[in-house]
Each structure stands twice: as C-alpha cells, then as structure tokens.
Amino acid sequence: MNRRSLLAALPLLLPGRAFAAEAFAPTAQDRVTIAAVEAYLNGIKRLRAKFLQVAPNGAISGGTMWLDRPGKMRFDYDPPAPFLLVANYGILLYHDKQLDQTSNIPLSQTPLGILLSDRVRLSGDVQVTGIDRLPGEVVLRIQRTGSPGDGSLALSFIDKPLTLRQWTVTDPQRQETRVTLLNPEAGGSFDAKLFEFKAPSGPFGGSNG
C-alpha cells in the first residue's frame, strides 16, 4: 500500500503541509489545567477501551484499543472494517486485512505519538494552541512545535474527575478524525504479542512505498 492509499484510509497518520502556528497566551487557570493534564497523562501507563471512530467523510467504525506507554498502541477494528493499527518500535503500522497490504511511518511524525511518549510534556517540543471549556468538559488543542505539518490533536477530558474521553486528529487538509473512548480501563497488564505484527515481508514490516 502506498502513502496515497494510506492517507485516504486514515488521514490522521500522515504529515503534509504545515499549519500556521496559532498564537495562544495561557492564563493562570490555563496553566493549572495544562499541569493537571500532564500529570494525568503521565499517570496512565496502560489503558484499554472500546472505541468509536468517525472519519472525515462521516464513516463510523469501532473496535478495541490498547495503549501501553511508552511507545505501544493497538487499534483492532471490528468487522466489517478490515483495519489494524499497531504502534511499536517507533513505527506506526497500518494493515488492511482485506487487501493484505501494510504501510508504516515513524511514530514521531504522527500526532498520536505525543500520547505515547515516555514522558508527556505539553511544552517545549509540544505546544498547546488552545483550551476550550465546556460544561463538564475541557479540551486541549496541541501540536508539535517544530513540525506543525504533522497535524494537530485535540484532547477532550471529563473535568471531574479528569478523564480522557475523546481525541480529534486534524490532518494538514483540516479534515478531522474523531475517536471516542468507551468504558476505558486503566492499569493491568497486556500480552506483549498484542503489539507485534508479522507481515508477509517480515516481522513488523510491510510496504512503505
């Protein structure tokens, strides 16, 4: 599968044209919120949840996701969606089971890579570009400081207690893919095999052309 096909299938994955940096001057309340979100995200080492995804074209799919920081994530889509997404070894891999085709890109070039860092920092290499406050909810918009062309990520939290509820990835064409977490469960242990993948061309490999 080539990059054009991957972009069409999952717009949240690929870098492209750069976003203009958004000016954001955090208030004292914003700084408290940013610190609380940092602490919360760094407190999550493992997370399992059902998910519901809405693509830019309105297509809805779901499945189960596992997050194991640092660096590991798996999205197993329910039928009829034939997709599998696995992050490990610094790579985000996408496999289309129906076509038996695989593509991968560096995790560091994806917005989701921010969540999988060994230590999540919402300053320095990552910048907060805005905070929205809604009844019972707070939304942080973030992007990589040095490579805004990777896209941006909006993290939505229930505010009391602070709980990650949803994220929205905006691609360089301003198209949004929204993922809502259902019944998330933090902690526990996962089988390491969840984050392994063997393509016909070799372990955790596949076409990247």
Whereabouts are the PLM-identified features?
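Surface-exposed, polar helix/loop patches in the mature regions of secreted/periplasmic/lumenal proteins
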Residues: 97-142
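A short, Trp-centered hydrophobic/proline-enriched beta-strand micro-motif
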Residues: 39-56
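Gly/Pro-enriched, hydrophobic low-complexity segments
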Residues: 123-209
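Boundary at the C-terminal end of the N-terminal hydrophobic targeting segment
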Residues: 18-25
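An acidic-aromatic
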Residues: 64-114, 177-178, 183
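Short hydrophobic/aromatic-rich beta-strand segments that constitute the beta-sheet cores
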Residues: 51, 73-77, 92-95, 140, ...
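N-terminal secretory signal peptides and thylakoid transit peptides that target proteins
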Residues: 1-14
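Extracytoplasmic
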Residues: 44-46, 60-62, 68-70, 80, ...
